[in-house]
């Protein structure tokens, strides 16, 4: 089961990180929520294999350290989500379906 495609309406915004919204719940270090609105990454599903970072032609993602998280200790953070060109490359290569892209 991948990211909830309705997280933008089903979850509360609980904060901001690197210029994008974070949707809860969040209970670090084990529950980190979904980061981003245009390009959402479920940090609790992300296994940090780097597929999305390598596939993105406009460098939407940067590595972010998440020590102590059970899935992986780093995440693909959508820090440049405003640059997204909606090619869906990241969505198509993510092995755990942790990414959802929706134009504003």
From Swiss-Prot:
<keyword id="KW-0249">Electron transport</keyword>
<keyword id="KW-0488">Methylation</keyword>
<feature type="binding site">
    <location>
        <position position="20"/>
    </location>
    <ligand>
        <name>Zn(2+)</name>
    </ligand>
</feature>
<keyword id="KW-0813">Transport</keyword>
<feature type="region of interest" description="N-terminal extension">
    <location>
        <begin position="2"/>
        <end position="37"/>
    </location>
</feature>
<dbReference type="InterPro" id="IPR017896">
    <property type="entry name" value="4Fe4S_Fe-S-bd"/>
</dbReference>
<dbReference type="GO" id="GO:0008270">
    <property type="term" value="F:zinc ion binding"/>
</dbReference>
<dbReference type="GO" id="GO:0051538">
    <property type="term" value="F:3 iron, 4 sulfur cluster binding"/>
</dbReference>
<feature type="domain" description="4Fe-4S ferredoxin-type 2">
    <location>
        <begin position="75"/>
        <end position="104"/>
    </location>
</feature>
<dbReference type="InterPro" id="IPR017900">
    <property type="entry name" value="4Fe4S_Fe_S_CS"/>
</dbReference>
<feature type="binding site">
    <location>
        <position position="90"/>
    </location>
    <ligand>
        <name>[4Fe-4S] cluster</name>
    </ligand>
</feature>
<dbReference type="Pfam" id="PF13237">
    <property type="entry name" value="Fer4_10"/>
</dbReference>
<feature type="binding site">
    <location>
        <position position="94"/>
    </location>
    <ligand>
        <name>[3Fe-4S] cluster</name>
    </ligand>
</feature>
<dbReference type="InterPro" id="IPR009157">
    <property type="entry name" value="Fd_Zn-bd"/>
</dbReference>
<feature type="modified residue" description="N6-methyllysine">
    <location>
        <position position="30"/>
    </location>
</feature>
<dbReference type="GO" id="GO:0009055">
    <property type="term" value="F:electron transfer activity"/>
</dbReference>
<feature type="binding site">
    <location>
        <position position="52"/>
    </location>
    <ligand>
        <name>[3Fe-4S] cluster</name>
    </ligand>
</feature>
<keyword id="KW-0862">Zinc</keyword>
<feature type="binding site">
    <location>
        <position position="77"/>
    </location>
    <ligand>
        <name>Zn(2+)</name>
    </ligand>
</feature>
<keyword id="KW-0004">4Fe-4S</keyword>
<dbReference type="GO" id="GO:0051539">
    <property type="term" value="F:4 iron, 4 sulfur cluster binding"/>
</dbReference>
<dbReference type="InterPro" id="IPR050572">
    <property type="entry name" value="Fe-S_Ferredoxin"/>
</dbReference>
<keyword id="KW-0479">Metal-binding</keyword>
<feature type="domain" description="4Fe-4S ferredoxin-type 1">
    <location>
        <begin position="38"/>
        <end position="66"/>
    </location>
</feature>
<feature type="binding site">
    <location>
        <position position="17"/>
    </location>
    <ligand>
        <name>Zn(2+)</name>
    </ligand>
</feature>
<feature type="binding site">
    <location>
        <position position="87"/>
    </location>
    <ligand>
        <name>[4Fe-4S] cluster</name>
    </ligand>
</feature>
<comment type="function">
    <text>Ferredoxins are iron-sulfur proteins that transfer electrons in a wide variety of metabolic reactions.</text>
</comment>
<feature type="binding site">
    <location>
        <position position="46"/>
    </location>
    <ligand>
        <name>[3Fe-4S] cluster</name>
    </ligand>
</feature>
<feature type="binding site">
    <location>
        <position position="84"/>
    </location>
    <ligand>
        <name>[4Fe-4S] cluster</name>
    </ligand>
</feature>
<dbReference type="GO" id="GO:0016491">
    <property type="term" value="F:oxidoreductase activity"/>
</dbReference>
<keyword id="KW-0408">Iron</keyword>
<feature type="binding site">
    <location>
        <position position="35"/>
    </location>
    <ligand>
        <name>Zn(2+)</name>
    </ligand>
</feature>
<keyword id="KW-0677">Repeat</keyword>
<keyword id="KW-0411">Iron-sulfur</keyword>
<keyword id="KW-0003">3Fe-4S</keyword>
<protein>
    <recommendedName>
        <fullName>Zinc-containing ferredoxin-1</fullName>
    </recommendedName>
</protein>
<feature type="binding site">
    <location>
        <position position="56"/>
    </location>
    <ligand>
        <name>[4Fe-4S] cluster</name>
    </ligand>
</feature>
